[in-house]
Amino acid sequence: KADLGKGNEYTFAVALDRTACREGHIEIVGAGPGDPDLISIRGRQMLEKADLILYAGSLVPKELTLCAKAGATVRSSADMNLEEQFALMKEFYDKGLFVVRLHTGDPCIYGAIQEQMNYFDQYGMDYHITPGISSFQAAAAALYSQFTIPEKVQTIILTRGEGRTPMPEKEQLHKLAQSQSTMCIFLSAG
């Protein structure tokens, strides 16, 4: 019963359709820089409730998946192509289950999520992104360093060196360095 004012009480009835199925959901989770202690609280919560955890086995430590609930499917994507990954996620999604796609670092920085989001959008699949701590942040902490210093440098450039994927001409490292900003260079060891 609810009182809608002026002493009038009303009773509301709610009917639930037992045949209705729960909609699936996909959570793209940033695993952080590799230390299981550095995953976000929300990221860990998503892992704990997932029915499927699909993680980048060549990059994400398996220890991050140890918090999976009993009965959850935990699978490395290292030996899967994109079509196989999508098929597995869609299979769980179509059953109304909760899927976590676990990526390294922050999935929005040099991640491979754009193709996945395009796929999810194409099939009308509900998804969300849980950011992660990026390796550049962990590196600063490990080095007891600060990337910005008042009146010295207030800009941070996140970039990568040229490799198999060429850099746009205007983003060549020597041109970016001319700004004398702090530069965090990803994917360039070796």
Where do the protein language model's features map onto the residues?
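Short, glycine-rich nucleotide/cofactor-binding loops
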Residues: I28-L38, G163-R164
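Short, acidic/polar
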Residues: D37-R42, E169
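Beta-strand/loop-alpha-helix module characteristic of Rossmann-like adenine-cofactor folds
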Residues: K1-I26, V99, D126-H128, S134-G190
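Generic anion/oxyanion-binding catalytic loop in active/binding sites
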Residues: G32-P36, G105, S181
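Class I S-adenosyl-L-methionine
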Residues: K1, A13-G30, I41-I133, A138
